[in-house]
Every structure is written in structure tokens, then in C-alpha cells.
Amino acid sequence: MGIRLGMHADNWRGQSGSFNDAVASAVKYDLKYLEAGTVNGQYFVSELGYDPSISILSNPVQIKRLLDENGLTLSMLDASYPIFGPQGSYYGIQYYTQVIRFAKELGAPKVDSVDSGNAPDLPKNEMLKITIGNYTEILKWAHDYNIIICIEPHGPYTGDGEFMLKLLGHFEDEHLRVNFDTGNTFIQGHDPLEYYKFLEKYIVSSHIKDVDEGLAAMCRGEETGIGCSPVSIGEGVNADNIRNVLLYMKERNFDGDVSIECDASEENIRKSVAWIRNVLGD
């Protein structure tokens, strides 16, 4: 199928928009794939229509009907609660197992996960050991429901290539893969294309995120990830890196999803979709 272009409904969070707003925009720009963030429980802001997250307590049949009526498929559910370390053990496992169930009900083939912040009081080998245990439990559900669990570079551990290879290599499991992120890897100080190649064996999807000049000057090499960027794809300092990654994906006949992440102003979405389609020659 090749590269499947979609976008993340979370783009509407900064706009106080709803999941329905994201659906309408995807239809407007002829995108067939949408990614959505999840919450555990009821978030009143979402229910009032001012946040695009989906509660895993929602009626999945109703959501699936909305997507089907608009010709959309969920590419991934973005659970993104820190699953690394003790925090993941206490709170993350039970959440991810239920997101896996919800993903299956919605027809989403993947669930995204992230690491925690740096834990200076916990040696890295201990963090790895605990995290392996956490994913071991999650993967039991992933196997039963045939859902791919993605690990996204978003923090100090996922930005550490050696740590990532130890974690992924421990399992060598087709149900544990990587959701790449062009913006986070740039902020971490990586050359996104080089880090993409380093993890390429495991990558099944990618967030496409540019970075504005001011944010890059303030955060690059100091932070490990950003939620969103105010600039459209192609208008930030990460544009050349994104182009290189996309062209490399195309050259390598990548078969998977790429999901636009930018603040969802009308102009940003329009420009981002057009820029990526131009790069890919679509």
C-alpha cells in the first residue's frame, strides 16, 4: 500500500477543537486516515467539544460509525501514558490493556506508547528491567487482540538508541514496533534521518512534525520531545530533515502510516497536507 498520509486529531487540542472537527478536516483535505488520543475515564472538556481526545469508556460502535460514514480509518490510538519504569507498572499497564481492547473495537491496528521523564535515582539497567516487565504484560493483550504496540521517541530513554535496541531486541516481537517522530528526534539532538535509519527495522509509522525556529533555539538538545508545533509542516527549521525522511521512506518502499502533527489552524493543515503531498509526488 505504500505511505499512507493521515493526521493526528490531537492537532485540535490547541484550538480547543473536538474529534468531530478533526474528522471534518480530514474529509475536507481528502485524507483517509486519522489518529486519535485516548483518555481513561470521562474528561468533561472533551464531552463539551473542546478537546479531541476519545474516552476509552465511549461507545466504540458510535465512533466507528462516524468514521465509516466519512470514509475514514483509524491508523492508531495514541495512548501515550508513560509506560517506562515504576509509574508504568503502577498505572500504565491497566490503562494500555484497555486501550488495546478499545483499539480492536474501533478497527485501529496500532497503539502508541511513550517513556517517562528521566529518573536520576533509578539506574538505566533497572529502568530497562522494569520496562521490559511492563511491556511483557501489555504484549499478552496485544497478541490476543492482534494489535501492534508502538514505542515513540519522546523522552530520554526512547531518545537513547542503545536503550531502544536493548528493549526492542529483548522481544524481537512483530507486535512491538516503533512510531517514529521527526520533531521529537530533532529536539533530542538527533539528525532525524540518521535516527530513522538506526531504528528502521522496527518502524511501522511516523509522526511528521516540524519545529519553529524559536522553539528549536530554546529546546533542542535540552528537551526530549514536544507535543505540537505552531508552524505547518515545511515552514520550520526541521523541514529539510522531514523531506529527507519522507524521500528515504519512499525510496525504501515504506508501507505504513505517516501522521501530520501541527497546530490545527486552517492554514496550517492546508499547507502541511500540500507540502507533504508535493514531497511524495502525490
Where are these regions (language model features)?
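Histidine-acidic metal/acid-base catalytic patches
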Residues: 1-33, 68-70, 107, 158-282
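Conserved beta-strand positions in the central sheet of alpha/beta enzyme cores
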Residues: 35, 76-78, 112, 150, ...
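Glycine-rich, proline-tolerant flexible connector loops at the mouths of alpha/beta enzymes
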Residues: 35-62, 118-122
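Flexible loop residues that form catalytic
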Residues: 39, 82, 116, 211, ...
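Short low-complexity, flexible loop/linker segments enriched in glycine and/or proline
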Residues: 48-52, 90-92, 126-128, 165-167, ...
